[in-house]
Amino acid sequence: MKVLVLNCGSSSIKYKLFDMDSKEVIAQGGIEKIGLKDSFLKLTLPNGEKKILEKDIPEHTVGVEFILNTLVSPEYGAIQSLEEINAVGHRMVHGGERFSKSVLLTKEVLEAFAACNDLAPLHNPANLKGVDAITAILPNVPQIGVFDTAFHQTMPEHAYLYAIPYELYKKYGVRRYGFHGTSHRYVSQRVCEYLGIKPEGLKLITCHIGNGGSIAAIKDGKCIDTSMGLTPLEGLMMGTRSGDIDAGAVTFIMDKEGLTTTGISNLLNKKSGVAGMMNGSSDMRDLEAAVAKGDPQAILTEQMYFYRIKKYIGAYAAALGGVDVILFTGGVGENQATCRAGVCEGLEFLGVKLDPEKNKVRGEEAIISTDDSRVKVVVIPTDEELLIASDTMAILDK
């Protein structure tokens, strides 16, 4: 059984082809710069070697077609024929309140998903383009949608509503939805397998820290709160996003700088966070190197970054009534020991004791707390694509 997983962004398509009998990735890659002159497909061959194939890719259907042709090509192919693809699983960003679990993509489902376009104007239309492309090229292959917002739909009303006129929620759906749900769900399930424990009774805080970052409070396997909101702009300080900011500061900046809503959105989403503090660079590795050299601006930026994560962990320990496991995932969470150490420093009052030696781990599953730490601190690399493929299989098996 082979499942193709697609993640279509506004100008990119990432893909992985899974052999679900062995849960192995047999082909993977991505297209970047769709609609621009220098678009290309970067793929990883089975031996780990990376290849770049340049091609003019004006829009998503051409991109999907290029990926499918590459999958069956004599030179780079992983399968003999496209008929070997049994199903396609799509990462769908914003399912609004309608979708609390993964579903077969029917005409009705796609119409309901398109109705959420206002909530994710960059991502949702791109997700739909991927679905349309598969429909055009492989019309008989079932397609499954896995929603980034779905896992957080178990949040109680008092956690997801904003304290603004209630009619704005009723009219426009203005509330907190949360994102990275597929990642939070994957690691929350995987950590139970890894530690040999049941989700029932477990108080878990999952920290997905990458260029974007979010934290989730998970009780009995269900999300009760998460740091991102109506959009991915709320919450943590991120690579280029501000995270939490006083709404009054937003209108103040708009007045002073003469910014439109598009202008302020651009400033807060693309020019803030680490990049805003570090003159445009959002790479945490650059920040770490600058801190090591003693750059005072870098040291301040890192303190701000760690502090915001730590503050959310404290808040979620309160929301959960305690915490049993703190989990790190995402590009930074999985690979950067300094980030994990900086975040956990000062959390001793919660029962957190980090083991400096164990914390040196990079990109592997590991317990990084001491044996006598009351709270287990764990690293679990995320695998959203595997979860999308697994959901796809589960729905087909029904």
Curated annotation (Swiss-Prot):
**Entry-linked CDD domains:** ASKHA_NBD_AcK_PK (cd24010)
The pathway is: Metabolic intermediate biosynthesis; acetyl-CoA biosynthesis; acetyl-CoA from acetate: step 1/2
Which EC class, in a word? transferase
Record keywords: ATP-binding, Cytoplasm, Kinase, Magnesium, Metal-binding, Nucleotide-binding, Transferase
Q: Which cofactor does it need?
A: Mg(2+); Mn(2+)
Reaction equation(s) it catalyzes: acetate + ATP = acetyl phosphate + ADP
Q: Which residues are involved in binding ATP?
A: K14, H208, I209, G210, N211, G212, D283, M284, R285, G331, V332, G333, E334, N335
Q: How is the cofactor bound?
A: Mg(2+). Can also accept Mn(2+).
Major localisation: cytoplasm
- A single GO cellular-component term on record: cytoplasm
Q: Which GO terms describe its molecular function?
A: acetate kinase activity; ATP binding; magnesium ion binding
Protein's cellular compartments: Cytoplasm
The active-site annotation reads D148
Gene Ontology BP, a term: acetate metabolic process
Site Transition state stabilizer: give positions: H180, R241
- Sequence positions that bind substrate: R91
Q: Cite the EC number.
A: 2.7.2.1
Residues the record lists as binding Mg(2+): N7, E384
Oligomer and partners: Homodimer.
UniProt record similarity statement = Belongs to the acetokinase family.
What HAMAP family has UniProt attached to this entry? Answer: Acetate_kinase
> What's its job?
Catalyzes the formation of acetyl phosphate from acetate and ATP. Can also catalyze the reverse reaction.
For this entry, the protein name equals Acetate kinase
Tell me the organism. Answer: Bacteroides fragilis (strain ATCC 25285 / DSM 2151 / CCUG 4856 / JCM 11019 / LMG 10263 / NCTC 9343 / Onslow / VPI 2553 / EN-2)
